[in-house]
Amino acid sequence: MDSILFWLVPVASVLALCFAYYFHKQMMKESEGTPQMIKIAAAVRKGAMSYLKQQYKIVGCVFLGLVILFSIMAYGFHVQNVWVPIAFLTGGFFSGLSGFLGMKTATYASARTANAARNSLNSGLRIAFRSGAVMGLVVVGLGLLDISFWYLLLNAVIPADALTPTHKLCVITTTMLTFGMGASTQALFARVGGGIYTKAADVGADLVGKVEAGIPEDDPRNPATIADNVGDNVGDVAGMGADLYESYCGSILATAALGAAAFIHSADTVMQFKAVIAPMLIAAVGILLSIIGIFSVRTKENATVKDLLGSLAFGTNLSSVLIVAATFLILWLLQLDNWIWISCAVVVGLLVGIVIGRSTEYYTSQSYRPTQKLSESGKTGPATVIISGIGLGMLSTAIPVIAVVVGIIASFLLASGFDFSNVGMGLYGIGIAAVGMLSTLGITLATDAYGPIADNAGGNAEMAGLGAEVRKRTDALDSLGNTTAATGKGFAIGSAALTGLALLASYIEEIRIGLTRLGTVDLSMPNGDVVSTANATFVDFMNYYDVTLMNPKVLSGMFLGSMMAFLFCGLTMNAVGRAAGHMVDEVRRQFREIKGILTGEAEPDYERCVAISTKGAQREMVIPSLIAILAPIATGLIFGVTGVLGLLIGGLSTGFVLAIFMANAGGAWDNAKKYVEEGNFGGKGGEVHKATVVGDTVGDPFKDTSGPSLNILIKLMSMVAIVMAGLTVAWSLF
């Protein structure tokens, strides 16, 4: 029965890809509209594909170098699993492929969404949302397909005769974890590079176009407007997709490894197998129910932003309610130990995700008081807008942090049978909560990818000179997109926190494998006891490595981890500043030298701005990304396992809170500007509007570059630590 249930995993992944193809074909049948709309969409598509081509060249070089390094470690020094180089490549390939397919769909969907909005609001919403669903379903489909492929392959090729049955599953799951580093590395380049690109273009377009020249957003007279629209795709579609692909795979793989570890001492291999496949089955059922939720999203004509939010919320909530019922059914069919309470841990994960999403919506949507007050602060100039936005961002961290803390404790206690000493099952519960939060990713990512599609549709309508009624509809879709994008960032950050914690626990399992590979059969405890490495518990490893707050290596690692979050943000913020500076200079040059741009008599050189953003993003993304990869390796070689654990704890705790602050402050600044543009506090062109545009410009790298990139930093450092565990155990200095 259990083996039969497992086949639901590859079947669900293939079904997700089939529906993604169906939604893509349906979208492509729609008309792109007028010749001008087609021309604009083609320019955006060309710029986006040109950027991805350049990015993948650089990422390919980095991957080649890392594969050579992993091959030397695996086949030369034997401190790493022999499957790591290949697993690393497949993780990166599928992550990149999901971003490419999602972005290609988004660039074809924007003009079709704008054209559909000429007929009705519901038509525009349907095309934009179902095109976003292509991204969501491709991510979960490819992710789960990769996981099921590797499980079946490793189960067939890893010999059972050299291992006890329970140890074989531990080796399989820890080996599978390593392809997560490929996904993480690709995701970091996609997020950082895409974030730098989109914000360099956005800041350049806003500062010179809106503030200096006084022309509206997406005005065809602005030379940076095509680059700005390209940026929405490379940052918020390809970047977000790679980010959540990594979280999705990471949470499932980490939980499977923790499930194998929880039953490593048991003679019951059947129960261990059930614990390993449970997170995969929950994810598989989540795919099926996400598809149902996607089909349920529709709205009425003349809907307000709240009505549109309600439409998307209905689809997401429907999927969430159904996944709760389905989880209880699946785990009952599995007859997993303590299945009722483990099912409740899935509910905890979903609730944490909902709380974080609603909290983000409250603090960033112009429908609520915090953002409205932020708009009002513009009466006294841009300085108070920036001060108020920073304060709002800091206050907004409270609810998500408390929600995650409650989620960690609740899921730990539920899975462990309310026994804090049952660490193995407790950590498995935290992993299950992370899987629960991401189980409806098919539809939640659809709402995220919808945002940039709607934004591009609005830009297309503005540049093509469509009527006021069409602009009103695309503005409504765009305004909703800003909120769903902000909510999506909060969701991504929350999932990164739980996934990061599950990966942190999985690191100990990788240390066990590393010690075994080096021939360390027994562990000598500080109290004189000797424990078999193969049978050591999490607590035994903590005692063996003296992982306590009074250990200077742990403290040093924690400080370094906290520093990494700020160092990384500083590097990415400065990168945006430098790239935006080049863009500002170019836009000013074109206004100055190309006569007739502002009167509409001459067309700007859009391609030059696209090339500047592309070049700037490629140049600036390498250093932050390499530092994120090298930090865990250097810490491990100097301070050993203890220092790495401190680094991961410090990076997780500080990075999580800092990411929420930056994402919410940036989202609030963006929507404060939108609230003024709706006609409040003097409307467009007034002094309050100019002040909120400055706030929005400051917030751009907060919410679209540094904040979201921290999610990946948290997970990538854990993944690098896991992959390099053998190196740390073998060659650490202290």
Curated annotation (Swiss-Prot):
Site (Determinant of potassium dependence) residue list: 485
An individual GO BP term: sodium ion transport
Residues annotated to bind substrate: 199, 703
The protein's Enzyme Commission number: 7.2.3.1
Primary enzyme class: translocase
Entry binding sites for Mg(2+) 2: 229, 232, 455
Binding site for Ca(2+): 670, 696, 700
Keyword Cell inner membrane assigned: yes
Membrane protein topology class: Multi-pass membrane protein
Pfam families noted in UniProt: H_PPase
UniProt: Mg(2+) 1 binding residues: 202, 206
Localization (cell): Cell inner membrane
Residue(s) at site: Important for ion transport: 191, 236, 243, 704, 715
Catalytic activity: Na(+)(in) + diphosphate + H2O = Na(+)(out) + 2 phosphate + H(+)
Function recorded in the entry: Sodium pump that utilizes the energy of pyrophosphate hydrolysis as the driving force for Na(+) movement across the membrane.
Known partners and oligomeric status: Homodimer.
Family according to the record: Belongs to the H(+)-translocating pyrophosphatase (TC 3.A.10) family. K(+)-stimulated subfamily.
Name listed for the protein in its UniProt record: Putative K(+)-stimulated pyrophosphate-energized sodium pump
